[in-house]
Amino acid sequence: DKMTFQPAAGAHGEFSGLLLIKAYHKSRNDEKRHKIIVPDSAHGTNPASASMVNYDVISVPSSSDGCVDIEALKAVVAKEGENIAGLMLTNPNTVGIFDKNILEITKLIHDVGGLCYYDGANLNAVMGWARPGDMGFDVVHLNLHKTFATPHGGGGPGSGPIGCKAFLQEFLPGYQVVQKDDYFDLVRYEKSYGMVKEFYGHFLVVLKALAYVMTLGKEGISEASANAVLNANYMKQELSDTFNMAYDGICMHEFVMSLEQLKHDYNVSALDVAKAMLDYGIHPPTMYFPLIVHEALMVEPTETEGKAQMDEAIKIYKEIYKTAIENPDIMHEMPLNTVVRRLDEVLAARKPILRYQAE
């Protein structure tokens, strides 16, 4: 119902959205609620954001179909009850599956007085087709770089707008645009929890997203989402005769393959396969995420790839798999043809060089 563009990135949106939930409970003198439920398949930023607002995190396991284990969730809700501030959930989730129990899940949380937070990381799969509010979510953040075509990477600037149901609008950060008769006014609600960024955040990033939405329109947005789902299912089907899929059936905009058997039989890891892809001039997919899938490769072709590009990628995946079986030792050396081969990623993480240093 209402939004703010102040948050400067997706994770910043999570933090800001959780502050919104916290302000709501505080206004009701219900500050005993200090626990957030997060599925074990969640993005790592979810528990990190909850911790930053001094919430304790309760992890709920996934069931064999990749969705939230509804019985485990019921047990947590029965035990914690009035301690629950809310639940954070991505839907479709990080294994690319739309949770069939989503209405039951959000109702369980609402019935004990908690709020439901929608991580918009996978909104690309449902935009124009389904609304988080209709699923029972009270707060949502959007990743403009993931869903609305704003620049991705390069150090920013970014934008992670948050939206909420009408009953939460008075807690939103900063000033809100309110229509009064024939003019608009800027209003700062008394219960607003403060500011998280100057003015309206990285406003030019928001304008780029607006240009994308206005260019595509309702039909174009829906088509982009449909193509993302179609492309993912096409690639999943074509690769399923070679790779082990983490979960069977129709996926949404992405799917996850498990290379655990390849690792066991030939000592070729998901990292080896990803590095080998660089020799073919193709960007490797996300590795080792979600953590609930061992030796995971997450494939998300997106809505922009045509069939020819996907067929080429499928061919490369299969060639690499064949190499892994016939010559596993060389897989540990790849890439062989790049300017820089295997970087010392541990050193880069522990001792990052974040600015130019003259010799």
Predicted features along the sequence, with ranges:
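Short loop-beta-helix segment that forms the pyridoxal 5′-phosphate
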Residues: D1-G17
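Glycine/charged-rich beta-loop-alpha catalytic/anionic-binding loops adjacent to active sites
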Residues: D1-K2, H141-H145, Y189-S192
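Acidic/polar loop patches that form or flank catalytic/metal-binding clefts of enzymes
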Residues: K2-T4, I58, L87, Y117-Y118, ...
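Short glycine-centered, acidic/aromatic-flanked micro-motifs in structured strand/loop junctions
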Residues: F5-P7, S62, L89-P92, M257-L259, ...
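Short, conserved micro-motifs enriched in small and acidic residues
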Residues: P7-H12, P151-G158, V196-F203, S222, ...
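Conserved PLP-enzyme active-site core in the AAT-like
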Residues: H12-K180, V268, E295
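Non-catalytic terminal extensions of PLP-dependent enzymes
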Residues: L19, K26, A130, Y183-V196, ...
